[in-house]
UniProtKB/Swiss-Prot annotation:
InterPro entries listed in its UniProt record: GIY-YIG_endonuc, GIY-YIG_endonuc_sf, GIY-YIG_UvrC_Cho, RuvA_2-like, UVR_dom, UVR_dom_sf, UvrABC_protein_C, UvrC
GO molecular function: DNA binding; excinuclease ABC activity
Origin species: Chlamydia muridarum (strain MoPn / Nigg)
Annotated ranges, domain GIY-YIG: 13-92
Gene name linked to the record: uvrC
GO cellular component: cytoplasm; excinuclease repair complex
Domain UVR: 206-241
Protein known as: UvrABC system protein C
Length: 598
């Protein structure tokens, strides 16, 4: 069936939900309407809805199904359920993954501790539990935990270790724990320290900042510049994560502020979380192919984002009112939040800040416009390359050889899906590439890409095709990108692309969006490969060449703490004492090696 043949005669004028499908019956988009006939009429008329993303959607639609309901509230709930069921390409769809970084305090233990966790739910899962966050990143979360352990000496050990300890650990000697495990402090003293830490996490950071500034000044006066620099880094992280910001005028409120950026089918929503005048964090959601109206988009987003156990603030600021007045009462909150477009100057400033955050997220996408249609037309791909994998490898004179692939999916990089391979073959780059590709596709448990991109010329392109043929994966498209020596255009080096449509290669203008898109993929893969190589190289040096007595387990703990060989050798004795498993002899050997390396 062609969409031009779709008839409105049998479409009801009642509230309901409509499902747009492609020629294969796949649901592309789910929408709701107060009047189904009027809404679909606006889509089907030639001069109806002229928004850029609507023709983009209708061009792919072959049929429309409708479901009639009693009222708008039922339509909203049904729309949300169908979006979850069919996961349409052009709707808002939030992935239910563990992306919240929080700090948790379990009050069930008589001597509570603060620990970093990752969780879906932003409301406590236990009756006696406090959650703080979410924080912008794992780095911010662990930085706060480090500050707390320094200024609020609470225990960090497991409950089992706490119950079996006979003497205090090294953290007590460093004045970073009150040692309640061996009775060195009273419960009243410990509780007072815990309450101060809780106030800090709620945003009362002024006293801590003042103490840090005084400590930095004292360390500088005593010429302990390395220690002063470490304190300054901590102070900077606190200010970035917890200090008063532009939102300080809303000191009494618990607010989420939703900002929206749109460009064609691209939609980005930023959520700023404000508590007691502090900007606690921001989360960003990118929908590369969204066809919803702004009011409908916010209804879908809010219903999904605040589903079930998610933290629900008292107020939600939005630039456009959701199209469902009953929305606050559909959320799982004891007190329905107020969802509104603020009229005050301060509220408008917050919305502007949220919009700016959303626009900032779009910059990497806007600088390289995603040329999906151009890619398909130029290279004659059989389908849209929604999932792209780019491969690279790194080594030094054949040692510590690593191969990697990165994933670009639905309009953005997906670092969680990046993978690393330790290369075992001892041939050239082609042999290493063949090993990586073979190992990647030998197991088909991971989702297959629509397109793979490799750094190399005609030989790499042919080798990739040969491997895919052997694995019976000829449906995966391949593009190889190679620098064209001697060819320059306006100071920009030209590069040649090899693919099935152009097996001898094609030269594109250096300003071409397609070329820049592939360069972006290749550069990200190269960056990831170099980082993986450096980690492997550092670990190899540490375990096999440099320091006796530092085995695999201690190496892992050191690298988790300091990230690189250079930082390990420059670490102070106090910093090294915080690494699990290191003895005084180990610390002495590391510092001796550091002096030799200077």
């Amino acid at each position: 069936m062609r969409i031009e043949d779709f008839s409105l005669k049998n479409v009801s004028s009642s509230p309901g939900v409509y499902l747009m499908k492609d020629s294969q019956g796949v649901v592309l988009y789910v929408g709701k309407a107060k009047n189904l006939r009027n809404r679909l009429s606006s889509y089907l008329q030639k001069n109806g809805d002229s928004r850029e993303r609507i023709p983009f959607l209708m061009k792919r639609t072959a049929d429309i199904d409708t479901i009639v309901v009693s009222n708008e509230t039922e339509a909203l709930l049904l729309e949300n359920n169908l979006i979850k069921k069919y996961q349409p390409r052009y709707n808002v769809l939030l992935k239910d993954d563990k992306t919240f970084f929080c700090l948790s305090i379990s009050l069930q233990h008589p001597w509570p501790k603060i620990e970093a966790i990752r969780t879906r739910a932003l409301s406590p899962s236990k009756k006696k539990q406090l959650l703080f966050g979410p924080y912008v990143s794992a780095e911010a979360c662990y930085a706060l935990l480090e500050v707390i352990s320094h200024w609020f000496p609470l225990r960090t050990c497991s409950d089992r270790e706490f119950s079996t300890r006979q003497r205090p650990c090294v953290l007590y000697e460093m004045k970073r724990c009150l040692a309640p495990c061996v009775g060195f402090c009273s419960q009243t003293e410990y509780q007072e320290t815990l309450e101060k830490a809780i106030l800090f996490l709620k945003g009362e950071v002024d006293t801590t900042i003042a103490n840090l500034e005084e400590a930095i000044k004292k360390a500088s006066q005593e010429h302990k510049f390395e220690h002063a620099a470490a304190l300054y880094r901590t102070l900077t992280l606190i200010r970035q994560t917890m200090a008063k910001q532009h939102v300080e005028k809303f000191q009494a409120y618990d607010i989420d502020v939703l900002g929206l950026y749109r460009k064609g089918p691209l939609a980005i929503i930023s959520v700023l979380s404000v508590y007691s005048g502090k900007l606690l964090g921001a989360r960003h959601f990118t929908f590369p192919e969204n066809a919803q109206e702004d009011s409908s988009l916010f209804s879908s987003f809010i219903l999904q984002y605040y589903a079930e156990n998610t933290r629900i603030p008292k107020q939600i600021f939005v630039p456009v009112s959701p199209d469902s007045p009953e929305l606050p009462y559909l959320l799982n909150a004891a007190e329905p939040p107020k969802i509104r477009c603020p009229k005050t100057e301060y509220g408008k400033e917050l919305l502007a800040l949220a919009h700016k955050n959303a626009a900032e997220q779009a910059k990497p996408l806007n600088s390289i416009t995603l040329p999906y249609e151009e890619l398909q037309q130029l290279f004659k791909f059989s389908q849209y390359p929604n999932r792209i994998e780019c491969y690279d490898n790194a080594h030094l004179q054949g040692e510590h050889n690593v191969g990697v692939y990165i994933v670009f999916e639905k309009g953005s990089f997906s670092p969680k899906q990046y993978r690393t391979f330790s290369i075992t073959s001892h041939g050239d780059d082609l042999a290493a590439f063949e090993e990586v590709l073979t190992r990647r596709f030998r197991s088909l448990t991971t989702e297959l890409p629509d397109l793979i991109v490799i750094d190399g010329g005609r030989n790499q392109f042919r080798r990739a095709q040969h491997i895919l043929e052997k694995l019976n994966l000829t449906g995966i498209a391949v593009v190889s990108i190679a620098k064209e020596s001697g060819n320059h255009s306006r100071g920009l080096q030209q590069e040649k692309l090899f693919c099935e449509a152009f097996p001898q290669g094609i030269l594109l203008n250096p300003t071409s969006e397609i070329l820049q898109f592939f360069q972006l993929l290749r550069d990200e893969a190269h960056r990831f490969a170099i980082n993986r190589y450096r980690n492997k190289h550092s670990k190899a040096i540490l375990t096999t060449k440099k320091i006796p007595g530092i085995g695999k387990t201690k190496t892992t703990h050191l690298l988790q703490k300091f990230k690189s060989w250079k930082r390990i050798l420059s670490a102070s004795e106090e910093e090294l004492k915080t690494v699990q498993g290191l003895t005084k002899k180990d610390i002495q050997r590391i510092q001796e090696e550091g002096k030799r390396a200077e």
